């Protein structure tokens, strides 16, 4: 059995869970998220906890138990506290600003890059070189952060580009004659 899957999920105050028709819905102060639960995994909701168990003894069922538990735990955390990713812009003239709900990036191209935010994800720019992406869906927040970073990933010689706040860029040495 999966060690991750065995641990029950404690529901914090303000979070409601509903399981019907193979869909698990989590409601909280930051929104509602829904996840389809695989038929090889059984879900039991009681006394403010969610417990997962494999439907049979196959390896696939054991693997899916841990996966489903991790996905639902992220949903519970997302609708109660939310997720955020911080990005920093490193480079002369690199700036970020909000244009309505969209993120406007000046990354050294001849044009500005405008990134539309998907539903449920918000961006903040506390300074011109910092971007904070927030949302209740961990997958969406990470995807948007990866897309923004992908416009100008850190280059290996000077480190200029868009990077995650905790990312260490290993710089290469330039060629010497």
Swiss-Prot record:
One of its GO terms (biological process) is cytoplasmic translation. InterPro entries: Ribosomal_uL6-like, Ribosomal_uL6-like_a/b-dom_sf, Ribosomal_uL6_a/b-dom, Ribosomal_uL6_bac-type, Ribosomal_uL6_CS. SUPFAM superfamilies: Ribosomal protein L6. The keyword Cytoplasm does not apply. One of its GO terms (cellular component) is cytosolic large ribosomal subunit. The keyword Transcription regulation does not apply. Keywords: Ribonucleoprotein, Ribosomal protein, RNA-binding, rRNA-binding. GO terms for molecular function: rRNA binding; structural constituent of ribosome. It comes from the Bacteria. Transmembrane segments: none annotated. This protein binds to the 23S rRNA, and is important in its secondary structure. It is located near the subunit interface in the base of the L7/L12 stalk, and near the tRNA binding site of the peptidyltransferase center. Belongs to the universal ribosomal protein uL6 family. Part of the 50S ribosomal subunit. This is Large ribosomal subunit protein uL6. It comes from Ralstonia nicotianae (strain ATCC BAA-1114 / GMI1000). The gene is rplF.
């Amino acid at each position: 059995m999966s060690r991750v899957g065995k641990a029950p999920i404690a529901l914090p105050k303000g979070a409601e869970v509903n399981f019907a028709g193979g869909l698990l819905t989590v409601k909280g102060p930051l929104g509602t998220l829904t996840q389809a639960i695989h038929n090889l995994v059984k879900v039991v909701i009681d006394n403010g906890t969610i417990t997962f168990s494999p439907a049979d003894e196959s390896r696939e069922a054991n693997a899916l138990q841990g996966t489903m538990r991790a996905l639902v735990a992220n949903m519970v955390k997302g609708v109660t506290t939310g997720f955020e990713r911080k990005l920093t812009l490193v480079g002369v003239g690199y700036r970020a600003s909000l244009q309505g709900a969209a993120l406007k990036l000046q990354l050294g191209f001849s044009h500005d890059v405008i990134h539309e935010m998907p539903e449920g994800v918000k961006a903040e720019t506390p300074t011109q070189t910092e971007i904070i992406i927030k949302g209740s869906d961990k997958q969406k927040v990470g995807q948007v952060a990866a897309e923004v970073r992908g416009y100008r990933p850190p280059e290996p010689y000077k480190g200029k580009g868009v990077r995650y706040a905790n990312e260490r860029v290993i710089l290469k040495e330039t060629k010497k004659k």
